[in-house]
Design a protein with these regions (language model features):
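Flexible "cap/lid" subdomain of the alpha/beta-hydrolase fold that forms the substrate-access gate
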Residues: 2-8, 15-17, 27, 55, ...
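Conserved HGGG/HGGXW glycine-rich cap/lid loop of the alpha/beta-hydrolase fold
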Residues: 15, 20-67
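Structured beta->alpha junctions
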Residues: 23, 33, 100, 269-272
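Proline-centered flexible-loop/turn and helix-kink motifs
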Residues: 35, 50, 116-117, 259, ...
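Conserved strand-to-helix beginnings and helix N-cap segments that scaffold or border functional pockets
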Residues: 41-42, 247-248, 277-278
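Short, well-ordered alpha-helices that flank and scaffold nucleotide-derived cofactor binding pockets
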Residues: 43-46, 50, 113-117, 282, ...
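Catalytic histidine-centered segment of alpha/beta-hydrolase-like enzymes
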Residues: 269-281
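Generic C-terminal helix-cap and adjacent flexible tail
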Residues: 286-300
Length: 300
């Protein structure tokens, strides 16, 4: 996995963010979701590195990134977005392109709202805006995304149950989607399991979700009350066999908060980069390349 990529641990915003870096062209930041790490991109990373300097990062609380103690704002998407902008600046990229999945796409949404000048364009995978998803939650969504409501329970109950059976937790979250466990290589699954077992990961995951059900909604409602919109081009893709497209209208919801939105469904489930890597590359590569003259290209 990740041929010719370099591993780095970069200090920024008071934490260390783990990442892999590969390629020698304009900058592309890749962000993963729950309960995974940057390894979700392993099927597309080498191709992307032919066109970009790819930075595949672990979010705070996940993978080999720091997992700070939970406080009110520690795992807000505002803080997590600042981590990633700081990472890119430390690497020499003031402006860059983003592709992000699941929780990483929620971080990318906040990044685009708070640091619009840094983001040239974004591809977001299998989410609708967090506020829309909470406000439109119904029985179908709650049953399918049970973990949203399990992980926000007060500590230490969810953390204790995850630690008691991390393999079972991963299989219950990842293996019950459209493609089952067949979407994940043994090597990738072993890496997800290793990282879930690290001290602080279960807490980081839970605090990520607790923030989304709390302070992140406050920030999103503030943006809505101010009429704040995302100005950069967005490509929105979701799994044809997943929950997001069944329970929400992704393009309509993103058009409520952003000015330039296009995209559609791909023939897969939730874990797009692992289930349908070639379809993802075909759908996103031209968009991600865009006007490459605007993208920084230095690496320190």
């Amino acid at each position: 996995m990740f041929t010719n990529y370099e591993k780095r641990l970069v200090e920024t915003n008071g934490v260390h963010i783990a990442c892999r870096i590969g390629g020698k062209r304009p900058a592309l930041l890749l962000l993963h979701g729950h309960p995974q790490t940057h390894v979700i991109w392993h099927r597309v990373a080498d191709t992307l590195a032919e066109h970009f300097t790819v930075v595949a990062a672990d979010l705070r609380g996940y993978g080999d990134s720091d997992k700070p103690d939970a406080q009110q704002l520690t795992y807000s998407k505002r803080e997590m977005a600042s981590d990633q902008v700081g990472l890119m600046r430390k690497l020499g990229f003031d402006r860059f392109v983003v592709m992000a999945h699941d929780r990483g796409a929620r971080v990318a949404h906040r990044m685009a709202a708070d640091h619009a000048d840094a983001i040239l364009r974004m591809a977001l995978l299998d989410i609708a805006p967090t506020l829309a998803m909470y406000e439109q939650t119904d029985e179908t969504f709650a049953r399918a995304y049970w973990h949203w409501f399990f992980l926000i329970r007060p500590a230490p109950l969810p953390e204790t149950l995850i630690h008691a059976d991390p393999v079972g937790y991963l299989r219950s979250v990842m293996g019950t989607r459209h493609a089952g466990m067949a979407a994940f290589t043994d090597e990738a699954f072993a890496e997800y399991l290793r990282c879930l077992r690290l001290p602080g990961t279960a807490t980081g995951i839970c605090e990520d979700y607790r923030a989304s059900a709390g302070i992140d909604l406050v920030h999103d409602r503030e943006d809505r009350s101010l009429g704040k919109r995302l100005p950069m081009p967005l490509k929105i893709f979701w799994g044809e066999h997943g929950v997001v497209g069944r329970c929400f209208d992704p393009l309509a919801e993103w058009r409520r908060v952003a000015d330039h939105v296009s995209g559609g469904a791909l023939s897969c489930g939730h874990y797009i980069a692992e289930e349908a890597p070639q379809a993802l590359l075909a759908a996103t590569l031209d968009f991600l390349q865009g006007n490459n003259g605007d993208v920084g290209s230095s690496l320190s």
